[in-house]
């Protein structure tokens, strides 16, 4: 089976690179087309992976103009449209190109719906909503990273007359976590937290979307309830204003950008991972934290919500209400050993091998005429 991946974020996202690599190991011949603004400081990681400078930073404001430039670049780079399937990794920007390929060459396509599709295109770019529905209706399959995003899209933006037909084409497949974390699972058992001491950790950009200010207010609420709480922050500083605010709190320690080996050690000396983001397609850091026995606090209705049954490895919270964050942290702390044990047990579902198997099975079902028997044999191995 030969699959064309259209992914505008391919070289900026290890997630998509890992997915392509994992499915290639399962017998899929993958070709990647990634339209980019610049290649400065960037290198394509593998064979049959094409990054093409064909758009500029202003094109994002002119959807149809950008789409035309992208399609022309695709046809120039890959003139022979001999694929069994197209996988568009962003429903609007990549899916619109896939729709055109289908109409011109008859090649079916899958689309993945992510945070940008829902919280930018559907929510803000109202004039493009009908095009979004068109892309979904003609897709052979619709992939969501979480059931929470599927529910959000169908509840808010899918017209009633299309819901049943579109729902039948949907599939929920999570992202996988880097093998490093699965090869270094924490083996120590969790103990009861002593003296109401709680060590929180966050890893990611220091920016508004990650909602560190609500985390700080939740810490204040916990202190009022008698907890001795601290927070370690690791990651890139995007907002200097926010950085100055969090580091002015004596309970917060900023440790900079850490390699994964050092981040692992930070996780192992912490109790709970907290990230009540406003918007999150998935949040790989949650899964990484789980591998080290850290229960997690995540936002209701965002990418990690519903990945696991509520209350299994943590709780969802209202990102606008610090009291819900404080209560979630307290609930976890009061039954900490059980949450820690379940956190480690749950991370197997984020193994890239398991994720790739789901994708190969889906590819086989929606791509008529492909060599499905050979691919199916690889899946069963």
Cite the ranges covered by each PLM segment.
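N-terminal subdomain of nucleotide-sugar transferases
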Residues: 1-45, 353, 360, 370, ...
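A short, active-site helix/loop in glycosyltransferases that binds the activated sugar's phosphate group
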Residues: 139-169
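Nucleotide-activated donor-binding/catalytic signature segment of Leloir-type glycosyltransferases, i.e.
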Residues: 242-258
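Short alpha-helical donor nucleotide-sugar binding micro-motif in glycosyltransferases
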Residues: 257-258, 265-270
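Aromatic "clamp/platform" in nucleotide-sugar-dependent glycosyltransferases that forms part
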Residues: 278
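Short hydrophobic beta-strand element within catalytic cores of glycosyltransferases
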Residues: 295-299
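Conserved acidic donor-binding segment of nucleotide-sugar-dependent glycosyltransferases
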Residues: 310-322, 330-334
């Amino acid at each position: 089976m030969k699959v064309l991946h259209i992914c505008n974020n391919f070289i900026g996202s290890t997630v998509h690179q890992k997915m392509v690599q994992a499915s290639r190991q399962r017998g899929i011949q993958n070709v990647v087309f990634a339209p980019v603004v610049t290649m400065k400081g960037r290198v394509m990681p593998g064979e049959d992976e094409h990054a093409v400078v064909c758009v500029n930073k202003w094109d994002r404001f002119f959807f149809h103009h950008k789409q035309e430039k992208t399609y022309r670049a695709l046809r120039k780079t890959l003139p022979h449209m001999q694929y069994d399937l197209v996988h568009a990794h962003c429903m609007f920007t990549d899916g619109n190109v896939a729709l055109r390929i289908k109409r011109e060459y008859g090649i079916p396509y899958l689309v993945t719906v992510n945070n940008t599709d829902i919280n930018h295109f559907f929510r803000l770019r109202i004039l493009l909503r009908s095009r979004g529905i068109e892309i979904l209706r003609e897709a052979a399959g619709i992939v969501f990273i979480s059931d929470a995003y599927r529910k959000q899209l169908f509840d808010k933006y899918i017209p009633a007359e299309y819901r049943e037909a579109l729902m039948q084409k949907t599939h929920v497949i999570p992202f996988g976590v880097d093998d490093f974390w699965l090869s270094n699972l924490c083996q120590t058992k969790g103990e009861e937290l002593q003296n109401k001491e709680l060590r929180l950790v966050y890893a990611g950009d220091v920016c508004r979307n990650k909602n560190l200010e609500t985390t700080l207010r939740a810490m204040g609420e916990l202190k009022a309830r008698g907890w001795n709480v601290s927070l370690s922050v690791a990651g890139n500083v995007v907002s200097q204003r926010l950085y100055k605010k969090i580091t002015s709190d004596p309970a917060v320690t900023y440790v900079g950008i850490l390699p994964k080996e050092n981040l692992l050690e930070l996780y192992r000396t912490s109790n709970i991972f907290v990230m009540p983001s406003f918007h999150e397609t998935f949040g790989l850091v949650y899964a990484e934290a789980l591998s080290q026995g850290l229960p997690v606090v995540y936002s209701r209705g965002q990418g990690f919500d519903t990945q696991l049954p509520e209350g299994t490895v943590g709780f969802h919270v209202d990102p606008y209400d610090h009291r819900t964050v404080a209560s979630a942290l307290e609930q976890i702390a009061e039954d900490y050993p059980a949450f820690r044990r379940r956190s480690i047990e749950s991370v197997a579902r984020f193994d890239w091998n398991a994720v790739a198997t789901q994708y190969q099975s889906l590819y086989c079902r929606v791509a008529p005429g492909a060599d499905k028997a050979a691919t199916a044999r690889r899946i069963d191995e």
